[in-house]
A protein has these predicted regions:
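A charged helix-plus-loop insertion that forms the helical arch/lid used to bind
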Residues: 11-24
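Active-site glycine-centered loops adjacent to acidic/histidine catalytic or metal-binding residues
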Residues: 45, 71, 238
Length: 243
């Protein structure tokens, strides 16, 4: 699995934002085929992650799985009947770059503004805290883990930021569910698996409240699950894609 938008026909990196300078345009698939002398199939990293969870993780046995990977950025993928939806350009699943009202006017790493990733990724959680309350450590920008540690200690300001990020995430999940109607929703990635505090009651409540605010009535009970494979998911999913 590779970060960025992978050309489904060639395996080249068709697009990557400024978080990954120099990655866009890399002929990954062709170069690996040449260097290894073997057949190579390249899939997006979160698409691989979703395949892993859908086939061998918490989504095993489910007809359709909507998976979001939340870390430095936010990616996603949709698996139905065992197949990941890549889209014509390979860009399907870039759910961090859907419009989010809570992010209105906030620049996104992709060069646009108002995207979910700008308020719900680990990087954005740190930035939001700094903008509202000042840096946790004056010597450097805050990151999501800093805010999580404060929240764990009962800090009301940190709890507010994490709640707002969770609500924005949940509301976007509700909108996506209205389009895709998945059997289950799976959350995974670095932010989710940093520790149990990311799955605290405050965070769970905010995600579910955001989801309930947007999902249609028949979708209100769609399970929102935490991925079970953690860092192994994209490795397992990449193998599943090749097979």
């Amino acid at each position: 699995g590779a970060a960025g938008v992978v050309d489904p026909k060639t395996g080249a990196i068709a697009y990557a934002n400024e978080i990954m300078p120099g990655w866009s345009g890399v002929q990954l698939g062709p170069r690996l085929r040449e260097d290894l002398g073997l057949p190579v199939a390249v899939v997006g990293d979160v698409q691989a992650h979703a395949l892993g969870e859908a086939h061998w993780g918490v989504g095993k046995g489910k007809f359709s799985v909507l998976c979001l990977g939340i870390g430095t950025g936010i990616g996603g993928a949709y698996v139905e009947n065992g197949r990941v939806m890549q889209g014509f350009h390979g860009a399907a699943g870039h759910m961090g770059h859907i419009e989010c009202s809570a992010a209105a006017g906030i620049p996104c790493a992709c060069g646009r503004s108002g995207h979910l990733e700008s308020v719900a990724s680990g990087t954005s959680i740190g930035r939001m805290y700094d903008e509202r309350f000042g840096r946790v450590d004056p010597s450097r920008p805050s990151v999501g883990r800093d805010v999580n540690d404060l929240c764990r200690a009962g800090d009301e300001k940190a709890t507010e930021v994490i709640y707002d990020a969770g609500f924005a995430l949940g509301a976007s999940l509700g909108s996506l569910a209205n389009i895709l109607d998945p059997e289950v929703i799976v959350l995974s990635g670095g932010v989710i698996h940093q520790g149990p505090d990311w799955r605290s009651q405050t965070w769970k409540d905010s995600v579910h409240e955001g989801y309930a605010s947007q999902a249609l009535d028949p979708l209100q009970d769609t399970p929102i699950l935490i991925g079970s494979l953690e860092g192994d998911a994209p490795l397992i999913g990449a193998a599943e894609h090749l097979l």
